[in-house]
A protein has these predicted regions:
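Glycine-rich phosphate-binding loop of ATP-dependent small-molecule kinases
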Residues: 1-225
Length: 225
């Protein structure tokens, strides 16, 4: 047998060396960042944090000393509970309502273009709003987190604030980076009662708007869908 014949790989060896089907498919290039963001909470959070650093400056990322994260089914009382929290914790600013943030010009531009407001966009809107100096003493966030990815982002956010606290401990900026205090509030309600309250709220809104239209006095209420 010649040297060339001896060095020739067997059929079994050739099959073993064949690339996987995914590597052979020319239509499948390297994974895009957008694809990873859908699943990777760390990528989402660190991307958002980097963007905030670029926009505001790292030393200006000062968040509220205390944050209440409020969630619950429609009709569970998310609209009424904040008043009690504000009174109890001596907060003066109205809650940050995620559904309202999604009506902002930036968010509407993406939605109108057929793009969904995903975890990355929502997380950035929420964190960006919390940087407002008016929330320095504390804030209530209504409607975040709502997905598993957002829950993981919230954990990373708490970790980052703890990291900033440690970094500035013992410095003249210590008071500007307080120890993070997160309160997770979940309001529960059974389905039947939820439906009843939503119907009642809708009826009251319709009646109020009809009165405003007839009298020309007052402001119309938004009909929630």
């Amino acid at each position: 047998m010649s040297v060339d014949q001896k060095s020739k790989p067997s059929q079994k060896e050739s099959l073993r060396k064949m690339p996987e089907p995914e590597d052979q498919d020319p239509t499948k290039g390297p994974k895009k960042v957008e694809d990873l963001e859908v699943k990777d909470a760390q990528l989402i959070f660190h991307t958002v944090w980097h963007e905030l650093e670029q926009e505001f400056g790292g030393e200006n990322l000062r968040f509220p000393a205390e944050i209440f994260w409020l969630n619950g089914s429609p009709g569970a009382g998310k609209g009424t509970q904040p008043a009690f929290i504000m009174e109890f914790r001596d907060l003066t600013e109205k809650p940050i309502i995620v559904s309202e943030l999604l009506k902002s010009p930036e968010a509407r531009k993406k939605i109108d273009a057929g793009m969904l407001a995903g975890d990355r966009e929502v997380t950035k809107l929420v964190l960006g709003s919390l940087l407002d100096p008016e929330y320095e003493s504390g804030a209530i966030v209504d409607g975040y987190p709502r997905t598993k990815t957002q829950v993981e982002c919230l954990k990373l956010f708490h970790g980052k604030l703890s990291e900033l606290r440690s970094k500035h401990l013992g410095t003249f900026q210590e008071s500007q980076f307080p120890k993070p205090r997160f309160h997770i509030i979940m309001l529960f309600i059974d389905e039947e009662e939820s439906v009843r309250r939503q119907l009642l709220r809708g009826q009251r809104t319709i009646a109020h708007n009809a009165e405003v239209e007839a009298s020309g006095v007052g402001e119309s209420w938004e009909i929630r869908k």
